[in-house]
């Protein structure tokens, strides 16, 4: 069980691993505010200026070092975005590093909240090259500067050799199955493409596999 509040003095940053994207040659720390953490940006930038001119400069990510495994895994984070996008929960099966020894995402999933919906991006890494595609999505309006709890459930489907991901946020719920979904992984949060605030993070595991029939599958 992981249960972290990101308010000032309520958590220990040294218990988390700072991660970078292979698309950028930097690794930023989050900035501590009274009630949350936020990815770094120049306060002189307006939201519109940040999005138009500095979107590649504000990436920050961290992962909890406790590996999650079980027939069912629940991960959630309370988050908000100031403008258009794009706070997310990240799931990575390994604690990979780049060629300089810095923690960096290779194969992983991103579950993203933004003003027009929810996206699940699947990243792969082969031959030294990072690539990605949109694995699942839902379109719905989400408001800036409003707190949302983004929930991700990963469940092993009984009788099948694969996992199902279910995403829920703001009354929107969807899911999908994919043989590439990991049965065990590390989880964390990423702020990017705008000012993103994170208020808490939770994760828990269980041993009950998903019964497709009981879940409405026919």
Segment roles from a protein language model:
Residues 40-46, 110-113, 179:
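Short, exposed beta-strand/loop patches in secreted or surface proteins that constitute
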Residues 126-149:
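Short, aromatic/His-centered strand-loop micro-motif at the edge of beta-sheets
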Residues 130-133, 172-177:
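Surface-exposed loop/edge segments in extracytoplasmic proteins
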Residues 75-77, 145-159, 165-167:
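Short tryptophan-centered beta-strand motifs in secreted/extracellular beta-sheet-rich domains
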Residues 54-125:
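Secretory/extracellular carbohydrate-interaction modules
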């Amino acid at each position: 069980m992981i249960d972290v509040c990101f308010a000032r003095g309520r958590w220990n940053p040294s218990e988390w691993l700072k991660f970078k994207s292979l698309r950028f040659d930097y690794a930023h720390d989050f900035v501590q505010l009274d009630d949350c953490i936020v990815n770094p940006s120049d306060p002189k930038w307006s939201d519109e200026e940040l999005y138009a001119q500095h979107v590649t400069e504000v990436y920050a990510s961290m992962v909890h070092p406790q590996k999650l495994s079980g027939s069912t895994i629940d991960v959630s984070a309370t988050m908000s975005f100031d403008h258009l996008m794009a706070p997310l929960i990240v799931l990575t099966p390994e604690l990979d590093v780049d060629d300089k020894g810095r923690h960096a995402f290779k194969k992983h999933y991103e579950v993203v909240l933004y003003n027009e919906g929810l996206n699940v991006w699947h990243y792969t890494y082969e031959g030294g090259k990072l690539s990605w595609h949109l694995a699942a999505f839902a379109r719905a309006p989400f408001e800036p500067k409003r707190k949302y709890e983004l929930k991700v459930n990963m469940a092993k489907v009984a009788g099948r050799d694969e996992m199902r991901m279910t995403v829920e946020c703001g009354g929107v719920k969807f899911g999908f199955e994919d043989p590439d979904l990991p049965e065990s992984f590390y989880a964390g949060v990423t702020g990017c493409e705008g000012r993103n605030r994170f208020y808490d993070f939770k994760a828990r595991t269980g041993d009950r596999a998903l019964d497709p029939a009981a879940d409405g599958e026919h």
